[in-house]
Swiss-Prot record:
Entry-linked SUPFAM superfamilies: S15/NS1 RNA-binding domain (SSF47060)
SMART domains: Ribosomal_S15 (SM01387)
Record organism: Lactococcus lactis subsp. cremoris (strain MG1363)
Function description: One of the primary rRNA binding proteins, it binds directly to 16S rRNA where it helps nucleate assembly of the platform of the 30S subunit by binding and bridging several RNA helices of the 16S rRNA. Forms an intersubunit bridge (bridge B4) with the 23S rRNA of the 50S subunit in the ribosome.
One GO term of the biological process aspect: translation
Keywords, alphabetical: Ribonucleoprotein, Ribosomal protein, RNA-binding, rRNA-binding
Gene Ontology CC annotation, any one: cytosolic small ribosomal subunit
Gene label: rpsO
A GO term for molecular function: structural constituent of ribosome
Family: Belongs to the universal ribosomal protein uS15 family.
One Pfam family linked to the record: Ribosomal_S15
Protein name per the record: Small ribosomal subunit protein uS15
Cross-referenced PROSITE patterns: RIBOSOMAL_S15
Subunit structure: Part of the 30S ribosomal subunit. Forms a bridge to the 50S subunit in the 70S ribosome, contacting the 23S rRNA.
Amino acid sequence: MAISKEKKQEIIAQYARKEGDTGSPEVQIAVLTWEINHLNDHIKSHKKDHATQRGLMKKIGHRRNLLGYLRGKDVQRYRELIASLGLRR
């Protein structure tokens, strides 16, 4: 199931750097993290859903690239984000 409009707006409001910010790395990573966690729950109960597994791996790769970009641009923002999202880095 895709992320609902209300949930996405909630995540954007929490991680946006300013009003109307939807494209900053923090927002993109936060939305991807929610989607990744949701897909992990789905895969736990549907182990043979290979299409979803592939989509999950693509999202993980996209998040990894964004995290690398943010780490290179601003280490402090990177550390704050991974602490607030609970990522293991």
